[in-house]
């Protein structure tokens, strides 16, 4: 049970609300602080602790993390509830456990897929049957050889017989080519197609799940499932199925032939097959178990990686890359442990199989000699039976390397199909429920009780009844965690209330069709999520499912532009070089917060919805935009039902009804004037936010406590559009005399098209470097691989000896028995040696392979964290793409280690030893046979090359589609509220379709070469028999010499063929190695690991910007700072204000040295920061940003991420927490500092998360404190307290604060007003108000008085 889960009846836990995601608003701050208690003193409600399980736009939590609640725990936690309430919670959390059989992997195969598979199966079986048929020809030729050696037939008769049999071999070869080609292409095609269907069904299922289900899922988990796990399935149902069927067909056909020839001998030899099956069955059980545990650990690691990469600015600012990497490595170590066990079991299983096979030969040969002496069978039949058993058993050895792929596929599918089979209780795809032809939009909550499924022990809303009349605006206010966002979640039907009803025009919304309901509602959240496409398409998403969806393109464009104008976004959009076609980047990161918010508002109003939900819709805007957008929203709200949640009370004064929520209950409601007159909680909230303007009473005589008139709005709109027009004009920066830094010169160009190419040898050395510490294991593995590879050539000699022993005449039967006993014993000895060598080689390479994967993942993760911020701004380095790279590509690296490497070495030894023995015993025949081997190798190499090309092409397509799926699922609330589920699925489907088409051509070409390499074995055999037979006919060779040369080369060549069945793994490995090498070779312009530059001992805190010009590397055409000059004296508190997109946050980013300026210089204490040691410099800075970043782990661990050291005195920690006003709250939790915060801090509210982030910043005791809208996520109460804490913390250090809420910065020593990347005004609050310039206008807009 998570530490936050305590007695549901205790006052501390009386109310903990799982937060919203896109509705982060509060997410639960606790009114423990004295100030907060005072403000709510009129209310007799108990003090509450509210914790919530979601953050920002939904990033689901990891099921493997501590905060996930298991079903059994849920049962215990909800035991005190009535049965019907328990049922509501359980249906929202229920998980399906599915048992998948291997054939279940094809559950989505189409009729065409099945037809292709049937044909491919027939061909694979036919291909496998070809080799055993050779034993019949072999028996026939053996007797022919015996007759020519005894001079029983003439040379001509012999030659005719020989030619006829050799031609049969050629026909078999042609048949083999056709069947192998068809089966390989067929299985790769159906494998890809079936996996595509699984990917599509999985995404569809994820999109139809209820939001409560996501509250316990890790963000990295969906990415891992849709990339790594589906790749495992594809690996298990593609060409390896064909290879396995072929091997099994060889086995079965060979044994049928053996039984027909002489069943007694065949039966005795078959006894070991039972032992083989038992060995495989027992081993597979362990393999599945260990494989699943390893996958689970990698999934948990994926979630950590996703959390860290998605908040890279925070990790960089605090220099905590090493600590975070260690957290990631904990999961990697766990995965390595289970992975190693898995591989060791596999090694022992293969060793046992080889040991049993060789023992089988010894047994068969020994019994055969007895039957021969008894006269029950002749030499030819024994040879056919033994040859058939040899080939059959050998082919069974080819099955085992694929067994792992099949078991992994089944393990991966179990989780994926579990999600696919889950019936969502709130299914947006469902057609159930009625739709209303006409409705007014009257919303009513009647006796609603709500409990979040992921926090079942806490009641967040108790018996709330609230009427929100049609066409009116209802505002919800109250402290963090009071249940405001819960109302939004219930109206959108993200959750089901456990009791009571939510009504729309008197209809219970659970009787209405879910998709239809959401299409009538538009939601704008505090932290808007845009999708990685153009502005135009983002706004157009608001039309999905509405009556305007299928309008003409001209009409749609008109609607979109009107919506943008209404949201005050049209001007800034048209000022962008590409206008509405500008790509906003993943989650809209290329736009400022205010710009994103305005596009989100445009998206919400474009469909003219009947119901509008505004969850702090203007909190991310600066005052100027807010005033205009607020007026636009008020205009948009006319005639429709609007629910507004606001921390800034100035935005809701005009609401028809204001509802004050505290502790999940309604404290009071009424209009602004009524509530202020009443003097209750609302009045105190208003006073907390009032800007202190007494000193400027004269200056503000006319403007005090007034709101904007329409004329003011029009004036500001004109001003804002006029100023925005400047953006449209190309700004030339005169760079004469300025030195453009290397980084900006490089960054301002588009990424180069060419990527470095590496030779195979370079990549092999590179991969080997990961295994340097395992050299002893590697050497053991290599030595034992060589020994294991010697088994087959030894067996060929033993086999030839067996044939010559069995050919002894009756007069030498006593010698025959003696020799038979000896050679049989030799087979048994070889079997024991094979068991030891195969097992040891498997275990040694298991250690190497798993450590390689762990080390590669760890190093890659650390290298990613080393990169500069510009690297993460690029589309190809999005969170999804990098998380996918870590999970998938590292797995591929093992294609040149472990089992593959061992098998290749073993095969090389087999081939080498076979050639040497053959040359020593009969060089003429050996040379003829060897001549074909280079052709075999060339075919295999070319196939390897083809697959590497195919791999690099397909990787891009899958990465793009996986990234798209990750973006959609991590923004699930936005997708759900826009009813974009089908749209998302269709885009994903189209991306996968395109990938399927490109890969097919590549598969057709590469399979041609693979089939050739298989067929050449038969031509090789034909050539060997023909030439060897000729030598026998001329009595140059005896039977022993012929069979040694022939067996050595035959099986040697077949081994050479099997090496290339590993070509797909090697192809993937080569491509992955190149990707890794490219990443490791990338030297960031601002290197977080760099030891260069001057290290600072102390910092006074004087800051100066001199004529700084800057453009973001991803948008070089868009100037951001245009000659910024700014001075901050040591210890000053400086505030930056201005419209969104004017360069305030950019100034903070440049000070943190996330980027380098294009021109000009930034000085701290008179030193250019680009010349300072980066880590030394950053250690004197602390950053608190608008969106607080917490990681999975405890509160204490999160606060300690503020410093590099692991140990810090307890009193420092406590002081930082007290300064941030979070200490009392932490102490009120049952687990105190050891409380788990959940994925991305989701168990805490926005206000609580922000205060933990502030404590983390203060723990560093920074000389320079950077506050980027540090209090914007807080409600008035928390903000007042935290602001006081920040004011106190700012004493004695230089502080730069970016703020939209002017009440937070009126005491600043200097306020700089930004516009268009320059400073237009500066001075103190009172000086600037007296100037009556731009700042005065902003103050006026935010003034909080009584209503109109």
Swiss-Prot record:
Q: Where in the cell is it found?
A: Cell membrane
Q: Where is the composition biased (Low complexity)?
A: 20-31
* Positions of ATP binding: 478-485, 1138-1145
Pfam families reported for this sequence = ABC_membrane (PF00664), ABC_tran (PF00005)
Family annotation (SUPFAM superfamilies): ABC transporter transmembrane region (SSF90123), P-loop containing nucleoside triphosphate hydrolases (SSF52540)
UniProt topology in membrane: Multi-pass membrane protein
Cited CDD domains: ABC_6TM_Pgp_ABCB1_D1_like, ABC_6TM_Pgp_ABCB1_D2_like, ABC_MTABC3_MDL1_MDL2
Polar residues: compositionally biased ranges:
1-10
Q: Which family does it belong to?
A: Belongs to the ABC transporter superfamily. ABCB family. Multidrug resistance exporter (TC 3.A.1.201) subfamily.
Which protein is depicted? ABC multidrug transporter atrD
Instruction: State the organism named in the record.
Output: Emericella nidulans
The coding gene here is atrD
